[in-house]
Amino acid sequence: MKRNDKILHYRGLN
């Protein structure tokens, strides 16, 4: 479930 980490990072940048 490392893909969730990328989504969280993307949301933080937004």
Swiss-Prot record:
<protein>
    <recommendedName>
        <fullName>Protein YabR</fullName>
    </recommendedName>
</protein>
